[in-house]
Structures are given as C-alpha cells and as structure tokens.
Design a protein with these regions (language model features):
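Bacterial N-terminal signal peptides
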Residues: 13-22
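Bacterial N-terminal signal peptides that target proteins for export
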Residues: 2-14
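Generic secretory/membrane-interface signal
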Residues: 4, 18-19, 61, 65
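Basic/polar N-terminal segments that are highly enriched at the extreme N-terminus
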Residues: 1-5, 22-29
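Cross-family detector of peptidyl-prolyl cis-trans isomerase
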Residues: 24-369
C-alpha cells in the first residue's frame, strides 16, 4: 500500500500557501506570517515556505548560504551562494536538484551537518516538498531538491525543511541545465524577522545536533549488540566485524578464483523487523535480481562485501549464518531498488545491519577457454 502524505504537512502547506496576490501585475505578492524563499529561475518564480521552527538548523544553513551570512568554502561572506546554480539533476517523477555553487574555489560549502528528521509532520508524501540531498546519513551540505511526486520511501533518510507554495508549474517545467538566478529570503512576522543565521549561531546548532546523533548511534549500536547476543550467542567474529555461525558443514574445497558457486540465500534487517529476500520463496518479499538459486562467479559477481567473501570461502553443501555490520553491507548509501508501478519502493536504509543465511548448493571450477 502506498503511504499517504501526512495531513499535518498538507495543512501546513495550505496555511503557508495563503499568498495573497495584490491587485495589479506590478505589485509584489504579500505573505502570511512565516519564512519564505523566492527562487527566481530562468523559467519563472518558485516560492518556498521554510520550516524554520521545526528544522531550525537546516533552515539556517539554507538561509545563511542564500544571504551570504554563513562562512563557506565557495564564496566570501556577503556573497549569495545559490545565485547562478544550475538544476544539475532532473529525474522525471522523482526530484529536481541543485546547490553546486558557481565557484572556482569549491563545489560545496566545505562543511557537513546532521539530518534533522521531523516525522510525520515533514515527509516526502507529495510533490513540492523541499529536502536536502546527501551522500549518506548526516552529510548534508548545500545541495537541495524539490520532489515531483510521492517519494515516501525517502522518509527518515533525508531532511524535509520546506514546501513549494507558489510556482509548482514552474518546478514541473524545470529541465537539466536550467538556472537559479537569485534566491531572496522573505521574513513576515516577529519570529521570522528574528531568524537571522550567522556562522556562530549555525555552528552552535550543528554541534548540538552532533551530540544528539552520537547518542542515537551509541544507543543503536547497543541495541544491535543486545539483539545479536540474545539470538546468536555462538556466532564467531571474523574479518571486518562480520560474525558467522556454521549451520551445516560442507565437503570438498572452496571455489577457485573465477569458479562458480550455485548459491541460495535469505536476508533480513532485524532492527527493522523485516525480511527482504529469500531464494527459497522465489525472491519474496522483494522480487530482486536473484529470485531463485543463482550462479555466483568468484571475483566477478557482487552482492555485498560480506556475502561475496563468504561465498568465496564456502564448500559445497555448506550453510552459514552471517551477521553483517553496515560497513560490510550497504554502508552509508543503503539500497534503493528499482520502483515498480503500483508498489511501494523497496529500501534498505543506510547504516543497517543485516542477517543472511547462505547455502552453497554446488561448486564448479573456472570455465576453460
């Protein structure tokens, strides 16, 4: 079932969208109380409502860069950061993305800051939501996106900090290479007028957020360790922090480089409480690239580092349980499957530890030329 957008988000968007256009084409729009960004593009004007009270750190980054009040590696203080940036990534039905500065000294702000997730209030459940792009958890910089549809599967991994309240037709018309000409910040009301980020205030927010993130990661690690001890107390730790237990011994020798292993496996994400693949069940619940026992060619086929290393060392008939830390699995990038019409997109979130059961059904020597 497709996740429905939060009603609270929609209500906020409607309130923010109370933009009253004054009579006469030459007069400027008037806004209800709030913080806005007028994004002038070569296609026309897009107006964003920024959630500076719910996501103050992320809004401070955007506003501080837009107005040149936060130090960065690309430009000196006072220089608007986003003026002239291109929409360098446009994926129909997904997002438009920009934020790489037109600078000869740097292609990013020279800093990163943590995620600021506010669910269910701020989600990706509809077109027009504004979020931060990143290269993994807590690596936000200056690149940001506008959704072009329901992208609910992004919830929890990317910070939503605003929404489009005017110019969605312009957003839908943006093509790769189109340009953000200027970004003007509009403050209406006492709270918004007091929101004036500086380098010092932004850094203080980031440091406070890092403390929160460090504690959350420590709590998650402790929960993982408790789960492993409770369910797999006999698992032995191997290379890279991967733990394993032999469920069934095999015969013969492991495959040679270039050899072929006929393998079956199942995988699950214990903390999320979900299974994501099982070759014995035709690939269910996710019909991935390996819906049945498959040929794994040592040194060529790639699943993830832990699975690859295990299959390369297993004998015919051997079955293992693998407990895979994120660093040996899908790391900070996670796994985003190809979306199928009418289905919720399958996702393994970044920094997720996984458990596999792997069985070697057959081992064959390298093919001769």
């Amino acid at each position: 079932m497709t996740k429905q957008p939060s009603l609270r988000v929609n209500a906020a968007a409607l309130a923010a969208g109370a933009i009253l256009l004054a009579a006469g084409a030459c007069q400027k729009p008037q806004y209800s109380e709030g913080l806005y960004a007028e994004v002038a593009t070569n296609k026309g004007l897009v107006v964003l409502s920024l959630e500076f009270e719910k996501t103050p750190m992320t809004a401070a980054n955007f506003v501080g860069l837009a107005e040149g009040t936060v130090e960065n590696a690309a430009f000196p203080l006072g220089r608007p950061y986003f003026d002239g940036v291109e929409w360098h990534r446009v994926v129909p039905g997904h997002v438009i993305q920009c934020g790489i500065p037109k600078s000869e000294t740097a292609k990013d702000p020279g800093f990163q800051f943590p995620n600021e997730i506010v669910l269910p209030d701020l989600n990706h459940g509809r077109a027009g939501m504004v979020n931060m792009a990143n290269g993994g958890p807590h690596t936000n910089g200056s690149q940001w996106c506008i959704t072009l549809g329901d992208r609910s599967y992004l919830d929890g991994d990317y910070t939503v900090f605003g929404q489009v309240v005017e110019g969605m037709d312009i957003v839908m018309s943006i093509a790769q290479g189109d340009v953000v000409q200027t970004v003007k910040i509009i403050r209406v009301g006492k709270k918004a007028k007091a929101f004036k980020p500086t380098t010092e205030s932004f850094k203080a927010m980031v440091e406070e957020a890092k403390v929160r993130v460090d504690q959350a990661e420590a709590d998650k690690k402790a929960k993982e360790e408790d789960l492993v001890k409770a369910n797999w107390p006999d698992a032995v730790e191997g290379e890279g922090g991967v733990k394993y237990a032999t469920l069934k011994t095999g015969q013969g020798k492991p495959p040679l480089p270039g050899g072929t292993v006929k393998a079956a496996y199942s995988g699950r994400a214990p903390l999320a409480g979900k299974s994501f693949v099982s070759t014995s069940e035709g690939g269910k619940p996710y019909w991935g690239e390996t819906p049945a026992p498959f040929d794994f060619i040592v040194g060529t086929t790639k699943v993830n580092p832990a699975v690859d290393a295990s299959l390369a060392s297993m004998k015919k008939g051997e079955k293992r349980l693998l407990i895979v830390p994120a660093a040996q699995g899908y790391k900070t990038s996670g796994f985003y499957a190809t979306q199928r019409p009418g289905e919720k997109r399958f996702v393994i979130s970044p920094n997720t530890f996984l458990v596999y059961e792997i069985e070697t059904l057959d081992v064959r020597p390298p093919a001769t030329k």
